[in-house]
């Protein structure tokens, strides 16, 4: 497990660890939720395939043959080993922040090898194994179907799971989740005895509640300790199965926010980068939630260069948040006693980020300064990105304005030919011509009458010219016909003379006879 990251553990065994705790719980202890295991800050996208993981786990781990029992014990041992590693990564490294990193890794691996075998003894009892097989049989009967996990399906699972839990004998909560301070010290001494280390401060409380417990006994704190209430097992189980619905709802909400917010609101500071809340009634600490800066930026800005710059800024925010996690836990896990007068007060819940009113010796100033440095660097980086984006937008507007007025080269204008622009230019030209005609100087009325008469005469002349041309065309045709008739008349006259001569000749011959 050395060198294995927090997200890698979540990908491989977090779902199996959670479900194993649900189905193999021997004394009815409350099911540790993902918030208790410390996975609150991990992205919601890792829970997309929770239903598929649950089905595969039930199918492979129920134990149809004889070899499954040994496999089950080996898997239990591996899961418990990973559980101890999770606790060590969260708490042991925080409590020993004064030591170097190499020594911390050696302690974590040594603690894992020694304690892993002792975490499994309640699971291997015969009665618990029989109860586990019954639970697995009921669970597999529910989840071997191919139906998708919907709201109605989730309600049915909740009802059946409640009936199954009611049939079992109710037992008390595990002292690990309700342990007071002296019980925590006992567990701490036992773990220290296994490993030979005596400075483990927060490893005894595996829940997320314990990671924020401060041993300070200052009476100036505003929160009072209350006993932990019972955690709803059904809600913890069904919340994992409804991961897909929650992820889709979150994506819809993000898209809706991106559509409503404008470009100016994105560049402004809309909300703090990290949000924290504390519910005093239920005593559940909500981790800091990272605002989805990258999603909003990439939805609004379409330029490739701008997108790369914004992704770099978002990655910077994520890296800063990851680097500050250990420092925050170090501030909250301070083991030095308070200097106030009240030494018998119960442990109080300390956020590690609020200012202390009493003279408590902790590393809150270190956390505050670290958060301030992260905030200032992030603000400066975001300011530079905002200025660059605004400059690019201004340049784009100037270029479009110059193209509209024709101040850019013809190549750019030819590339963006627009019919609307052509119609606008033609309309403006016609309006200019009409305006020039309307700007002629005024003349007297008699001159206007004369000009009107002249215009009428011009029209008549044009009509007469048309008529004359028509008549000339007609005359030319008639002239041609007349010439043809005259030629025929001459031919007929010649023929008449010839006939007359012939008649005279015949008469003369007749007279001679």
From Swiss-Prot:
Record's keyword terms, sorted: Coiled coil, Nodulation, Nucleus
Signal peptide, first to last residue: none
Main location: nucleus
Ranges of Polar residues composition bias in the record: 359-381
Deletion consequences: No visible phenotype under normal growth conditions, but roots of mutant plants are impaired in the interaction with rhizobia, specifically in infection thread (IT) formation in symbiotic roots.
Region (Disordered) residue spans: 327-435
One of the GO BP terms on file: nodulation
Coiled-coil annotated residue ranges, if any: 447-513
Keyword Nucleus assigned: yes
Gene Ontology molecular function terms on file: sequence-specific DNA binding
Compositional bias segments (type: Basic and acidic residues): 384-396
Residue positions of motif Nuclear localization signal: 397-401, 421-424
Taxonomy, superkingdom: Eukaryota
Biased composition annotated in UniProt, kind: Low complexity: 334-347
Cell compartment(s), UniProt: Nucleus
One GO cellular component term noted in the UniProt record for this chain: nucleus
Function, as annotated: Involved symbiotic signaling. Required for root infection by symbiotic rhizobia, infection thread (IT) formation, and nodule development. Required for symbiosome formation (i.e. the release of the bacteria from the ITs) and subsequent symbiosome development. Involved in arbuscular mycorrhizal (AM) symbiosis.
Family statement drawn from the similarity comment of this UniProt entry: Belongs to the CYCLOPS family.
Protein name: Protein CYCLOPS
Organism: Pisum sativum (Garden pea)
């Amino acid at each position: 497990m050395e060198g294995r990251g927090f997200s890698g553990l979540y990908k491989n065994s977090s779902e199996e660890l959670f479900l194993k705790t649900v189905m193999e719980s021997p004394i009815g202890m409350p099911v540790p939720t993902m918030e208790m295991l410390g996975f609150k800050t991990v992205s919601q996208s890792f829970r997309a395939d929770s239903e598929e993981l649950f089905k595969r786990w039930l199918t492979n781990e129920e134990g149809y043959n004889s070899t499954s029992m040994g496999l089950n014990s080996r898997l239990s041992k591996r899961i418990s080993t990973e559980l101890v590693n999770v606790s060590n990564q969260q708490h042991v490294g925080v409590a020993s922040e004064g030591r170097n990193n190499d020594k911390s890794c050696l302690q974590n691996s040594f603690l894992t090898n020694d304690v892993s075998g002792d975490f499994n003894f309640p699971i291997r009892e015969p009665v618990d194994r029989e109860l586990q097989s019954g639970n697995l049989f009921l669970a597999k009967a529910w989840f071997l179907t191919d139906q998708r996990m919907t709201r109605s399906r989730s309600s049915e699972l909740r009802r059946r799971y409640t009936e199954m839990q009611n049939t079992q004998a109710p037992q008390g909560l595990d002292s690990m989740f309700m342990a007071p301070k002296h019980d925590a010290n006992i567990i701490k001494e036992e773990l220290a005895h296994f490993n030979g280390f005596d400075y483990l401060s927060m490893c005894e409380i595996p829940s997320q509640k314990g990671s924020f417990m401060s041993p300070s006994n200052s009476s100036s704190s505003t929160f009072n300790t209350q006993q932990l209430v019972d955690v709803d097992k059904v809600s913890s189980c069904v919340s994992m199965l409804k991961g897909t619905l929650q992820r889709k709802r979150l994506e819809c909400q993000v898209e809706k926010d991106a559509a409503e917010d404008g470009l100016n609101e994105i560049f402004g500071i809309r909300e703090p980068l990290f949000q924290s809340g504390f519910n005093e009634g239920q005593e559940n600490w909500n981790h800091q939630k990272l605002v989805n800066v990258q999603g909003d930026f990439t939805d609004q800005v379409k330029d490739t260069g701008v997108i790369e710059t914004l992704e770099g800024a978002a990655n910077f925010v994520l890296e800063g948040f990851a680097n500050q996690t250990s420092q925050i836990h170090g501030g909250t896990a301070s083991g030095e006693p308070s200097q106030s007068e009240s030494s018998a007060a119960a442990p109080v819940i300390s956020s590690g980020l609020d200012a202390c009113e009493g003279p408590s010796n902790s590393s809150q100033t270190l956390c505050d300064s670290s958060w301030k440095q992260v905030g200032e660097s992030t603000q400066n980086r975001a300011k530079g990105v905002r200025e660059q984006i605004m400059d690019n937008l201004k340049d784009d507007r100037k270029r479009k304005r110059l193209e509209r007025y024709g101040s850019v080269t013809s190549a750019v204008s030819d590339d963006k030919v627009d019919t609307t622009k052509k119609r606008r230019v033609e309309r403006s030209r016609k309006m200019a011509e009409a305006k020039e005609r309307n700007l002629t100087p005024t003349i007297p009325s008699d001159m206007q009458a004369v000009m009107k008469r002249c215009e009428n005469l011009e029209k008549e002349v044009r009509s007469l010219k048309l008529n004359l041309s028509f008549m000339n065309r007609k005359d030319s045709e008639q002239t041609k016909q007349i010439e043809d008739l005259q030629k025929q008349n001459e031919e007929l006259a010649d023929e008449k003379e010839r006939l007359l001569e012939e008649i005279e000749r015949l008469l003369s011959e007749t007279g001679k006879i």
